[in-house]
């Protein structure tokens, strides 16, 4: 029985899930908006929000924790230099999930997940 087990399995083993969310978190931090399936977006929110909360307090220990979770120095730099200060006054809720219809091949529900205070120049580039 799966009583009180949190998180979705997403038909993957644990190492595949961990690698997938590590890559997706890096993409979300880098591009500030990504398109994925709705269940993956909802699970990704549980990975990215604690990373941004960690980035609000800049210290060597926090940078090492963030690197351990993302394995990418470029992502760690953006988290602590841009996103941490940007969300300093916001107490959680750094991401927004927007449903965007269904995928053509398998009718899977799709969604955009984006950072809330995303800069408008990136929004215009994504729209084009």
Curated annotation (Swiss-Prot):
* InterPro entries named in the record: Ribosomal_bL17, Ribosomal_bL17_CS, Ribosomal_bL17_sf
Q: Which GO terms describe its molecular function?
A: structural constituent of ribosome
Look up keyword Ribosomal protein and say if it applies: yes
Cite the SUPFAM superfamilies for this sequence. Prokaryotic ribosomal protein L17
Q: Name one Pfam family in it.
A: Ribosomal_L17
GO BP, sorted A to Z: translation
Q: Is the keyword Ribosomal protein in the record?
A: yes
- GO CC field: cytosolic large ribosomal subunit
UniProt keyword annotations, A-Z: Ribonucleoprotein, Ribosomal protein
NCBIfam families listed in its UniProt record = L17 (TIGR00059)
Sequence similarity: Belongs to the bacterial ribosomal protein bL17 family.
Listed under subunit, the entry gives: Part of the 50S ribosomal subunit. Contacts protein L32.
Put simply, this protein is called Large ribosomal subunit protein bL17
Q: Which organism is it from?
A: Enterobacter sp. (strain 638)
Its lineage opens with:
Bacteria, Pseudomonadati, Pseudomonadota, Gammaproteobacteria, Enterobacterales
């Amino acid at each position: 029985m799966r009583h009180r087990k949190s998180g979705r399995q997403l038909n993957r083993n644990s190492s595949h899930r961990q690698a997938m969310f590590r890559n997706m978190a890096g993409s979300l931090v880098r591009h500030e908006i990504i398109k994925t399936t709705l269940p993956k977006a909802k699970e990704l929110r549980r990975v990215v929000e604690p990373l941004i909360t960690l980035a609000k307090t800049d210290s060597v220990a926090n940078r090492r924790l963030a690197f351990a979770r993302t394995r990418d120095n470029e992502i760690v730099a953006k988290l602590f230099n841009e996103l941490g200060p940007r969300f300093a006054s916001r107490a959680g809720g750094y991401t927004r999930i927007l449903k965007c219809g269904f995928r053509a091949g398998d009718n899977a529900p799709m969604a955009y997940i984006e950072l809330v205070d995303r800069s408008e120049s990136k929004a215009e580039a994504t729209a084009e």
